[in-house]
């Protein structure tokens, strides 16, 4: 089997000559043993990789992580209580045995000297279950395993990759200019482009709602659409194509302009309210730990835990408290409305006694005060923990774990080679994504498009990356 390069293929230029082994047969062998026999060498070892220490360990770790994922996703039988309890007990035994072997293999790999490139290989090497399946990497499962998530070596490796990108192959004595040129686009730079585009969009949207177009009494179609409006529409489209988790404001902006074509949203239109809602959501998203965000630009280990703390302790707490008190609060408000009004639901009612009105007013105010007190109590509970070795855990272990997950997922998301950040991704969507999706249906090879993607990136995106890298060389 030969691995065809894709957009997810890493820039690590050290691929072995021999094809990498498949995982399918090894996973089937693990199903036939008990948890006590899981650590047998012949089950987890791949002789084909015996002379490649990093890939050998990567294969074994990925095999166990995939097997762990398979076991934990298995649904239990609900027919019999004893059967369900037995299955849960067996699952705990399996997970414990798998985790012990994962830690054993990882610590055994670290017990001997290994370079930064070795760590990259073990985390980012792609293996497939079968010849046509999607590739899997150890890094894809790090956030799902508690020991690997809190491992200091993995943390340092991902922080280094975030700032500098994947290392070049030190065994290759001939380093050409193009690999170094490609390496300029680190995950940090890629994210900075994303965040910069979002900030530019936010500024233009603020200018629009502060100074909307003022059409003349008689104007031609599309006359009020200027460069500002065109840029807002283009960035909205590119953000949606980019699949940002926080692309709702961009979709609202695009919808506002579409429904008003050939004119533009005006303060008297409902579409203008969509722009205001989009602006409010964008401002709120600046405080969320989801990329792109300002917390990933400088010292994520200090800023991301604070963002996660605020989201979990404040927004999460408010949502829980409101959900808890909402039924009684709604009833109190409804009863208060009935008591204060002589007409309710088109039914004439006699005025309620003053004592009744006072009671429902007291109930509504009391529920609101209880909600505020509950929020304050829950927010202040376990907000700060004792001093810890890692800055990620200075608020609490749970907050540190959640912050690491957000950071690691961001590193994975922005580690794609030859990326096309917005608005360049519109060009990528038209010239690369659509053909690679359509042509396989006609049995036409798409391998040419990976080379096209590289060349387009080097010509169009690369110069902007080089300039950005020059001005931010010492920042991250």
Feature map (PLM): residue ranges:
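Hydrophobic alpha-helical transmembrane segments corresponding to the first two to three helices
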Residues: 166-297
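Extended, intrinsically disordered cytoplasmic tails
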Residues: 1-2, 6, 10, 18, ...
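Charge-rich cytosolic interhelical loops and cytosolic tails of multi-pass membrane proteins
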Residues: 134-136, 283, 289, 293-299, ...
